[in-house]
């Protein structure tokens, strides 16, 4: 029971809605501006550590060099939201508006993450099309778009032709099914993730109750977990040398399927997509477009990141929910401080 409480503490963030809904528009704006400044500072540090190879932020143990840039994966936790906030709802004006947005955009690219880079560009282009009502408005965002498209071309040209296509070929030929025969290395990241999900999916199919609702919220490294699971696909625990059985930062779907099962995962996705649709329908309201794009980015990168799984990533959508419902209030339109 204690282990379940420890594992489920993240779900308490869902209760933050009842606190956040009491905030006024001015209080929300002030909080967001402060958090935006914090993320900008974190993004600067993250970019510096990429070029210097010196860890400046916590959680920087795992990294590898990629010629000019050292790849770190400890990017700011709130970056995914505030990169869109900086583009579409930036509280600054003049050159500071563009500099602050550019800092966050550069931070998105620094991990040299293929799926994140491509997903971000595609979603940003979608956001610009949803945002603009006229060609003149699109031209205002054109410099920002060009800054994003140029790295995309480089990433697609240099990496999609090699590693990505090899990964896709391995997955489409079904190599992940023969889990014990998989040889994972630098060139098989997508194959690793699919195999990781597949092994856990096959496990829950062994019992009807787990097929429907998953194996539960047991903690990693607990006695129960060590007895119940014996997965062979996963990262190695540096302390014990054993394979990490439940937790993974590589793919959200493994966490979802092993914890919630098929029905539980479908319920979670139904709620998540309903929130996305809500913000899409109200995208003219301030912060709604940024929130929709943020949720879409979490969904797009769910095969290479675990952030979709964590309830605390929904704090911003919960914060804006009530004020978005007041869409007829002219003070809440997307036009203020965004031109």
Feature roles, as predicted:
Residues 56, 187-260:
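Long extracytoplasmic/lumenal interhelical loops at the membrane interface
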Residues 155-205, 218-220:
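Juxtamembrane membrane-water interface segments immediately following transmembrane helices
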Residues 329-339:
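Short, intrinsically disordered terminal tails adjacent to the first/last structured region
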């Amino acid at each position: 029971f204690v282990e379940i409480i420890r594992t489920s503490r993240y779900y308490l963030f869902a209760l933050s809605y009842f606190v956040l809904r009491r905030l006024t528009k001015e209080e929300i704006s002030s909080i967001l501006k402060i958090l935006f400044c914090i993320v900008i500072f974190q993004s600067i540090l993250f970019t510096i550590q990429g070029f210097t190879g010196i860890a400046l932020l916590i959680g920087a143990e795992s990294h590898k060099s990629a010629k000019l840039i050292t790849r770190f994966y400890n990017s700011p936790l709130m970056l995914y939201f505030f990169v869109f906030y900086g583009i579409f709802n930036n509280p600054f004006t003049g050159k500071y508006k563009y500099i602050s947005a550019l800092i966050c955009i550069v931070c998105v690219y620094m991990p040299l993450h293929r799926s994140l880079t491509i997903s971000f560009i595609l979603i940003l282009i979608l956001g610009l099309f949803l945002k603009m009502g006229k060609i003149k408005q699109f031209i205002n965002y054109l410099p920002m778009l060009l800054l994003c498209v140029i790295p995309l071309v480089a990433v697609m040209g240099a990496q999609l032709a090699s590693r990505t296509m090899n990964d896709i070929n391995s997955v489409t030929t079904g190599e992940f099914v023969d889990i014990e025969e998989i040889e994972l290395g630098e060139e098989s990241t997508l194959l690793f993730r699919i195999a990781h999900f597949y092994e856990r999916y096959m496990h829950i199919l062994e019992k009807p109750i787990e097929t429907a609702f998953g194996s539960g919220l047991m903690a990693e490294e607990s006695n129960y977990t060590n007895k119940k699971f014996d997965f062979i696909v996963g990262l190695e625990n540096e302390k014990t040398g054993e394979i990490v059985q439940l937790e993974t930062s590589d793919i959200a779907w493994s966490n979802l399927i092993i914890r919630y099962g098929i029905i539980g995962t479908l319920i979670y996705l139904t709620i998540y997509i309903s929130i996305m649709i809500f913000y899409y329908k109200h995208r003219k309201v301030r912060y709604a477009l940024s929130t929709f794009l943020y949720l879409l980015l979490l969904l797009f990168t769910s095969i290479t990141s675990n952030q979709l799984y964590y309830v605390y990533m929904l704090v911003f959508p919960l914060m804006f929910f009530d004020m978005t419902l007041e869409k007829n209030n002219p003070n809440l339109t997307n036009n203020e401080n965004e031109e």
